[in-house]
């Protein structure tokens, strides 16, 4: 297929067009790392529909497909078929295997409702696929696609032609199956594999008719993909013994499973893969770019290839080594997204294998096991689960409603109008754990085609229907040219929604129709009502049960410290929420500590970053649930009332009475299992033996019918020789044992324990298998606290809130529940039932024997304690409780707050004093003392276990690169102005600019006054920055790195164009997966001005970026930022955790210039204690994994690697360099050097030296000067020089990635004897470029973009330069992304955010790509005639944006979705008018923009802090969540709005204030004038009728404004009268 030439841009303007026909050709040679060969081969397969009027459009799309990609990827390895002879002996579900495969995609389907097969459907699918190339990735060769493919009906005409030629056709369609097979590349091995296939079919009585070598064009395959390209063949079989389609499909499914099992013992097993084996569908796919797919497979070019439908898929994988089988579609599904709960899902699927039975399998269930493959991707495993259900008789729609249910509990419409659907979900909630995570799922079994969206609606999905009876669904609109007059319906899938096409009947079933049909198939409501029991709430105890001495002994025995009791339990009992703290976790890891730790401390929570988003549990709680079902889970393949026989709990937190009620439930047959072990014969081996006996007892109890096991450490009297097994170890061991023995589905594990009091501990127990926990000692501690004289006195004097004894316990449980929601949400998980058993933790410091017995599959990279050592640590608590000199109070271990004699804190007072002395006195000797202090400290971090080595002779320091060169690699952390004071923020920036290093603005914007050099300094003071001292003329206070965080506060076009680098903060070391909130008391007038908000109004930063729900979304934001400022480098900040290397690969392919790896020990202004202590990992492991993965994938040279988190000195810098870092970040140390005294009260706004306070009287005490920080960094650089000289190296470049200069220290600590540091010391090789060369590379480019051509027009240039008015009209396509962003950048650089007096009136016609009209500035008036995708108007600071459908559409505009999700995100000005509906999260985090739209999805106006939004149609759920400023007006014609509004903050009222009425009417009038809206015109025509139907949403900050208060004018006039009087 020849590449068609591109047409001219279709402009209409007063003057002739200046754009030539060649201007929009594909021009890849400008891209970083792309060769001419690549440019020539960049083509799109297939042709467009023959719409004569749009032929130019077709050609244009072909010419511009993906002109902006400079980042690509592929996958690694091949899926491993289980080699087990029995499914229960299969490989353990290992998190590291799962984390190696992550990704996202672009997907869609086309279906003809008349069920007419045509080649046009196939061509259109390939065209649409090509127009989503930007959603895919390529490997390090820039040419091997991550994967693309199509699923269609079997092209019988094509195959019959071939069959006739071979003398074996035509085929009997009703009894012929076709397999699309990847065989081993080696010819001999391929023949072996074919023999296994033949033998298996023969064994099943199925005739193999013939094999067909699939004709392919290998020349279009990328180098990496070609190396692993399989031998691709098709096998044709005849099935005579079955007649029905379902039975034939089942027989083929069994055959495929048997072939996989037979092949598993061969070395080539992983190279044999059936893409499809069916009588209905076939899949063509491979590690190919989307535009190459149709050229690679000649079949797809053959007009005899006809199909009534096609599903297409383009993959973006974070991994890069080609892996052909993981291209999609899978056998039933095309998946765009990621399953967060995959490890738990696989464990539970493995657990249910023995219980799965169905008559349709005729006793052959054993032959179709296993149902999952831990070596495959999450998408492949979800497909396997769906395949099992569908082949067992479920429809695809029903299967996906079971696996991926919507958030039905808080859905008023569903509960009122479709109760049968609610009953269906209630029934299956106890049978199948949700496969949770972002997911747009396309599905087909050949009879139906459809799509559904996850419960959170986190992937885009648009659909439309035409007059010729074709339905389209796609990740983006504009992937095909459409005559709008022939489009009869346009819409989008919202959260949890589904659309289905029945190919035989030609019916299209939209969401509620699908759900109702499925749910009505059985009497689920009757079964649930009769069998599902709810646990009734039982009152908390009103008296203490233990004497003071007894409770003290219990607390000591079970590992409590005074900090645990006072700062955690008592705080939660008093406040009802989790306590917060600050400054990060600066104590040793548990395995390196000299203090005893509870087992939980060896576990770190995992969290979402990049590949899936975190959730806001406070503002989006409607999608979350802590409900738990207790009891036996039934056979998922059969339905019946007995499956509903369970007890439902509202949460997993039980009090004593509720536990007793469960134990007494006769149907559960609860069995109590005590967990004490006897040490009278010694400790060695005792714990392991007792665990084995516990597991055997659990096994026996389940076989005897117990549906609830209660593991308990409760005893009337504790015995000194019978300590309790760590409850987490007991739960994990029993859970794993029951899985391995096929018994796990028959029972629930409930815990009755003293060893649980923090949210992290609850999460660990649930994550490793417990369904519910009764924390009896924590509840007793709450009771004792409430009854103590001290508490009574504090309540009497009003120093703490007054609570009853019952309320204290209720508060504690409330805090635990909210903490659990936060832990789930930071991983992006909505349901506790999905979290249970999902093992979403990383282990630091436990040995293989511990992991194998209780935590199989969890990541544990460094080994650690053995079972016997763990027993001794447990015993150390027990011994203290029974020793003769037992303390009369709990010990304070100092794990949270520094205290003399407590746990060692790296950031201790002595360290701070030594550093202050060195930098303030500019004393080298004092710095040497500081160095010695660090060198002599206890082992605290992983790098303390390492030391340098070298085979080189030392050299003179004079030969080493100068300190001035080294300091250029230093940067400071992203500390927001708001969290820290203006004085601190500016002093740090000035110091870094003096050095040539980089400071980081943090979130919140930056005062433009800081962008100019100081010229008015006299005696160290400047009238420009009068609050600072120690200044010099020429100083600048600008932050070289400007941060884009989730709240987008202060992010304006001018802010971005004045950056040297832009950092996208995905996560923060001290609280990864969480957002933030700047309290109103810290929002001064100055802070409010910078953040475009009001003083005193709390400012909420969401947990996720709402334009980053996947890896391709991140690539889009990077694209947006490169668009507005092509000269800036874009960095992405990640936090160390298992799998970060895989994520980093995707980030590198997403065109990031810098990747920053942050350690868990980074600082924070405020965070929950559990997050500070128990989330994130050491940067040593994260950096090593990132560097090694990038090296292995050939991506290391693309990015600068930066590291931060607890760096203190030159030794730390050298260690980080050896592990692969190019640059080095200092956060807490930079603050200490500028005056911080580590008071650790940042979160209170009471910092005694004004470093972290907005109180003016405290800020006046700020002691720092920029020179102090300059001195510190120069000392660090000189220290680096000294070490380099000792090792014999002349420059840092020489050691970066050289782990061979590191070796383990000869040191033996109490708990580190079995630590294995080989992971850190491993080497994957070195980059092919030096670090300096990598750092000096040009910024990654977006390549040729539409904005560049617009900016080349002389009239546009003249209008910008001379502030004139110009009018232009431009054609636009979905591949044109971030259009207007570069134009806005040019204007902002010249005029700032408000200075441009000209007008650029640009009209775009067509379907705009993502981020249309991004970062608009005043003077830019943009009109789109057509439709757009996600992120319209993102970050706009001014101007006007109008979106209207094309003229004479075949649909009603007010009923159609014409803009996508997350529009107006972070807007700080301007107006937008949309004639039609928007998707989810319209106006999220809007600051000052005004908008009119005719309907929205869920979460509209979320986190708004200003501006005004008018909605003239229906809205989704959760309106105005987190909205602290601005106003919203919503038309409510059918009286359904109020239940949809999140009432936590806003007040709902009618529009009664005359000023508000005028504001509303003026905006609607403008909307009608600019868009021609018929809906708006109808409202204005009958204003008196419609005005009372509007609601006004008013947050507290707006209550006294004239727009919201009808009393305002009266009060104003009365005040004026009084003044005149």
From Swiss-Prot:
- State the pathway, as annotated in the record: Amino-acid biosynthesis; L-glutamate biosynthesis via GLT pathway; L-glutamate from 2-oxoglutarate and L-glutamine (ferredoxin route): step 1/1; Energy metabolism; nitrogen metabolism
What is the free-text note on the cofactor? Binds 1 [3Fe-4S] cluster.
Identify the catalytic residues: 105 (nucleophile)
What EC number(s) has UniProt assigned to this enzyme?
Answer: 1.4.7.1
GO-annotated molecular function: 3 iron, 4 sulfur cluster binding; enzyme binding; glutamate synthase (ferredoxin) activity; glutamate synthase activity; metal ion binding
Q: What Gene Ontology terms for biological process does this UniProt record contain?
A: ammonia assimilation cycle; glutamate biosynthetic process; L-glutamate biosynthetic process
Cofactor(s) recorded in Swiss-Prot or TrEMBL:
[3Fe-4S] cluster; FMN
Which residues make up the binding site for FMN? 1183-1240
Expression tissues: Expressed in young leaves. Not detected in mature leaves.
Does the entry feature the keyword RNA-binding, yes or no? no
GO CC, alphabetical: chloroplast stroma
- Residues forming the Glutamine amidotransferase type-2 domain are 105-504
Q: Name its cellular compartments.
A: Plastid, Chloroplast stroma
Q: How is its activity regulated?
A: Inhibited by N-bromosuccinimide, which is specific for modification of tryptophan residues probably involved in the electron transfer from ferredoxin.
User: Could you tell me the superkingdom of the organism this chain comes from?
Assistant: Eukaryota
Record-linked InterPro entries: Aldolase_TIM (IPR013785), ET-N_metabolism_enzyme (IPR050711), GATase_2_dom (IPR017932), Glu_synth_asu_C (IPR002489), Glu_synth_asu_C_sf (IPR036485), Glu_synth_centr_N (IPR006982), Glu_synthdom (IPR002932), Ntn_hydrolases_N (IPR029055)
Q: Any idea which positions bind [3Fe-4S] cluster?
A: 1236, 1242, 1247
- Tell me which residues form the transit peptide: 1-57
PANTHER family in alphabetical order: FAD NADPH DEHYDROGENASE/OXIDOREDUCTASE, GLUTAMATE SYNTHASE (NADH)
Give the record's family classification: Belongs to the glutamate synthase family.
Which NCBIfam families is this protein grouped with? PRK11750.1
Q: What is this protein called?
A: Ferredoxin-dependent glutamate synthase, chloroplastic
Gene for this chain: FdGOGAT
